[in-house]
């Protein structure tokens, strides 16, 4: 727990107005367990609109985090607000476990329409990416009558027990304290920039893809082909926006078909237009068996979904998809509105266009600052890999200093990645061009200050990060 004295010391290192924020920060540390998250800055959200947020002290920020890629349509979008208000006036919710409810059925129609696959599909719901991952695991096991699940090192799938067990980014020693479920197996993800095989995946993507596929097939055979599902983020998000070779994803799908394994496409972060496609998997020309969606689906309201082949979804017996508030009417109404906003405002196309622009701008910075080792992304899901100059060695502390200075200058942009050294860029898909440009300007100023040693090491003690 950070002491009162430590927070009193913060005035030595920042001139930012944060007195009202600190009141809540101290209460948070008193009442909320530390396991509830990483707190990057001593700021408390007071209100938000579009691509901007304001804290308790009235400081205004451009939001490049969007609550961890939740607000694809921007904060408090009028269309989403209207849908929520209209549904609340009718009724909050009634359990789908016993009666029929219209909004989740209408939402299912839309999800079936916008997901890949020209076959009959069905949809089940939850409240977070974590529980949706759990539901996808249930479906894979019920359908195949097998038990083992293969996922990837440095993946992030959530914190319910099934999702936690599938997640590969956590410190194994810490994870072991919670006794994760058995029958989960992790293999290496083909990271083109930094992998254990020493392969430059940008220069030789085929070699990287084949090395990873060989490891997966060995694992399948080691498990006597008793594998129910392989769960994959088409682009690893919290690992630092890691994009595998296209042929890897295509050949992985072929491998699952060969062995009768369910291909689970985890789109919690990459879905809903974030990568310049409705779903990240569409960059690879692959049709999954199951798609997991959450985060941006509800436009800020908590809802998740698993969309999958009808025969797989119907293999799960009653009542194993039931939650009391499954398909919550208010949240489902928000999700319907969110999908309609993305369609009407052409945000998928906008994400692709702005993403290309951002990659160009950030790669121009890379030419100036050798501490930028790699810039990668699709659409408006972008990672900037901060390294020790002249190497590929991650520089986590420097990345955190850049993030801190950006906050001081009015930009919310945290760090993440398997080494904690990647700048996370995921603004709303409808962010105004001027906000995008101002954000890049702040990033450059913050990098310059960090490189020139203008950000003291002491700020790191106020920043809890990946």
Swiss-Prot record:
Catalysis performed (reactions): an L-alpha-amino acid = a D-alpha-amino acid; L-phenylalanine = D-phenylalanine; L-leucine = D-leucine; L-methionine = D-methionine
Keyword Isomerase included in the entry's annotation: yes
Record EC number: 5.1.1.10
Activity's thermal dependence: Shows extremely high thermostability. Retains full activity after incubation at 80 degrees Celsius for at least 2 hours.
Residues where pyridoxal 5'-phosphate binds: 129-130, 269, 324
Assigned keywords, A-Z: Isomerase, Pyridoxal phosphate
Protein name: Broad substrate specificity amino-acid racemase
